[in-house]
Swiss-Prot record:
SUPFAM superfamilies: Ribulose-phoshate binding barrel. It catalyses: 5-[(5-phospho-1-deoxy-D-ribulos-1-ylimino)methylamino]-1-(5-phospho-beta-D-ribosyl)imidazole-4-carboxamide + L-glutamine = D-erythro-1-(imidazol-4-yl)glycerol 3-phosphate + 5-amino-1-(5-phospho-beta-D-ribosyl)imidazole-4-carboxamide + L-glutamate + H(+). The gene is hisF. Pfam families: His_biosynth. PANTHER family: IMIDAZOLE GLYCEROL PHOSPHATE SYNTHASE HISHF, IMIDAZOLE GLYCEROL PHOSPHATE SYNTHASE SUBUNIT HISF/H IGP SYNTHASE SUBUNIT HISF/H. Its EC number is 4.3.2.10. It is found in: Cytoplasm. This is Imidazole glycerol phosphate synthase subunit HisF. IGPS catalyzes the conversion of PRFAR and glutamine to IGP, AICAR and glutamate. The HisF subunit catalyzes the cyclization activity that produces IGP and AICAR from PRFAR using the ammonia provided by the HisH subunit. Heterodimer of HisH and HisF.
């Protein structure tokens, strides 16, 4: 059985790591490069960096941060936010990222998924999905709707349909974020995670809501996710990556304990 990945997520704004609840009330919690180094040394399998306001503010890429991270850590990392073109993808990969995450830009221009996969390989293209629970209706039969621009804009797109479409277009992985659960630390949206995981064949990363090790266990077992994104539970020192992995290992979830 493939090992399950534990992936710290660093939301970056103006070159600093921030954290909020449901994409709001963000506070500064540190330097992203230094935090990445700490998590790398603690045993993270990968790290994700999101420039959380680049798409909304139509700003450029955080290339300087990417370069510094690439010089500091030696595990895969992905970068999202502000990536609108294949040229942006190339520049970010050349700066040292292993993967590119597209979210708002892919919803507005789905061809960026197929173009990126063709040029760089599907393994480099991650679809970020920000999802809200809504009333089921004709356009949203799953009851989960895609939102973009940091949760500001509802798109009238069904999350399950979009996950399948992104896979068809060539995405190699999905990072599935529940905005309803984001930063609340009460657990991932297991229903959403399982729905997407069972209906695509590419890896799914559960995101939004981790507060205790049991939450990761539930996402990786009941939710059938391939990986789990964590933020608040390690950013604020409530848990360690080593402690989380030990908890999972003791309960039969395959994780990489040591390099």
């Amino acid at each position: 059985m493939l090992t399950r990945r534990i992936i710290p997520c660093l939301d970056v704004r103006d070159g600093r790591t921030t954290k909020g609840i449901k994409f709001e009330n963000n506070v500064d919690i540190g330097d992203p490069v230094e935090m990445a180094k700490v998590y790398y040394e603690a045993g993270a399998d990968e790290i994700v960096f999101y420039d959380i306001t680049a798409s909304h503010e139509k700003r450029g890429l955080m290339i300087d941060v990417v370069r510094k991270v690439a010089e500091t850590i030696f595990i895969p990392f992905s970068v999202g936010g502000g990536i609108r073109t294949v040229t942006d993808m190339r520049d970010t990969l050349l700066a040292g990222a292993e993967k590119i995450s597209v979210n708002s830009s892919a919803v507005q221009n789905p061809a960026i998924i197929s173009e990126g996969a063709e040029k760089f390989g599907s393994q480099c293209v991650v679809l970020g999905m920000d999802v809200k629970r809504v009333e089921k209706r004709k356009e949203i039969p799953s009851g989960f709707e895609i939102v973009i621009n940091g949760g500001r804009t509802y798109m009238g797109i069904d999350a399950l349909w979009w996950a399948r479409e992104a896979q068809r277009l060539g995405a190699g992985e999905i990072c599935l974020n529940s905005i309803d659960a984001d930063g609340v630390c009460r657990g991932y949206d297991i229903e959403l995670t399982r729905l997407i995981s069972e209906n695509v064949t590419i890896p799914v990363i559960a995101s939004g809501g981790a507060g205790e090790p049991v939450h990761l266990h539930d996402a990786l077992t009941e939710g059938r996710a391939d990986a789990a994104l964590i933020a608040s539970m390690v950013h604020y020192g409530h848990h360690t990556i080593g402690g989380i992995k030990e908890y999972l290992d003791q309960r039969g979830v395959p994780v990489r304990m040591k390099w």
